[in-house]
């Protein structure tokens, strides 16, 4: 039985690799992501072609002092565009655009408006044939996705398991022990 640390605990590629959360350009300014990471393929050191940004947003209709209110989905599209342009020189050089990694910007909305509570929406690029029946392979244009996860309960929407899990995990109405118990009993999740 080996006792060398490299033999007993061999290197395993991480499934998730954290990235720098600051994206700074001279002409476009700075974007500070809450969390950004690359997803890795299981059982290999190769990266999956996914870059994921995760944002926790308290205000569902944020206000910019100069310009007034804006929509989170539009900010998510901008974040995706920045994550794509930041790949030049890293994921691809010159005109090797086929090497662009798909990006996701996922927004966990803590206090959405009442009608948005419990909603899970996804926004992405889609092909529309305006004339003719030619089709491009989806992998060539499916490069960005914005997802809004709106917490809270809504009697008009059947609660998804993900929203139920996040509602419990992030609840400010439950004690730590109550959260632990509910997460384990309802979702089989053991919090440490």
What are these regions (language model features)?
Residues 1-192:
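Elongated, amphipathic alpha-helical interaction scaffolds
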